[in-house]
Amino acid sequence: YRPFDTEDFDAIALILQQLWHNNSDNDEYNRLEAACDLAYCLSSSTFSQVAVIDGEARGIALARAGQNSGVTINEHWMDTERALLSQMRELEPDACAEYLSFVRATIRTNNRLLESSPLPHDNEVTLLAVDRDVHGLGVGTVLLDAAVSHLSSLGATRAHLYTDSNCSWKFYELHGFKRTATHRANREERRHDMPRESFLYELDLTA
């Protein structure tokens, strides 16, 4: 286990592609979409931990502590995200437009979830993804613990994350997170491939 290195990018993006970015018949487009998602997550995170097995990156946890993230790193990944979006538009304009609609709907939903909770808007686990081939080996637990420990070490009293009915939300409950808000997708949101239910989970770091 170690911090994210730029050389991990392609391997981690492939994990995200296999988990969440496989809607298009065009594999190259799916690859770009997953890479774009990863770049976005990296741009808004201040902590990273990667699981390396046999020299290969097989999982990642990202977290954001407070609002003062490193500007240079953020700008690099934001530029990367913009460049990937441009390639996506050229390759599959309709699929790209649908992806952007999904992203906007997700952001709106997450904001609604947070507004309905007394949580502060910082100290978030922004990404947790593990290669399906190593599920069940405890990799996700180590990565999540690393992210939460990092937030706690900086004085955070609570951490939060977003997940949904398409993901392994029970995993977070097993690790002490409690569901504090739920959003059920309406017909319009379902049309944009939004999950049936989206959840906000929080963890008390003082316990």
Question: How would you name each of these model-derived features?
Answer:
Residues 1-14, 25, 65-66:
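A short beta-loop-alpha structural element at the N-terminal edge
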Residues 130, 136-149, 174:
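Conserved acetyl-CoA-binding loop-helix of GNAT-fold acetyltransferases
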Residues 26-53, 58, 62, 83-86, ...:
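Active-site rim helix/loop that mediates acceptor-substrate recognition in acyltransferases
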Residues 1-7, 18, 58, 203-207:
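Conserved N-terminal entry element of GNAT/NAT acetyltransferase domains
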Residues 122-123, 151-164:
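Conserved GNAT acetyl-CoA-binding A-motif
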Residues 67-123, 187-194:
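Conserved acyl-donor/pantetheine-binding loop and adjacent beta-alpha core of acyl/acetyltransferases
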Residues 126-135, 160-170, 185-189:
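Conserved beta-strand-loop-alpha-helix junction that forms the acyl-donor binding cleft
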Residues 111, 141, 165-182:
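Conserved active-site alpha-helix within GNAT-family acetyltransferase domains
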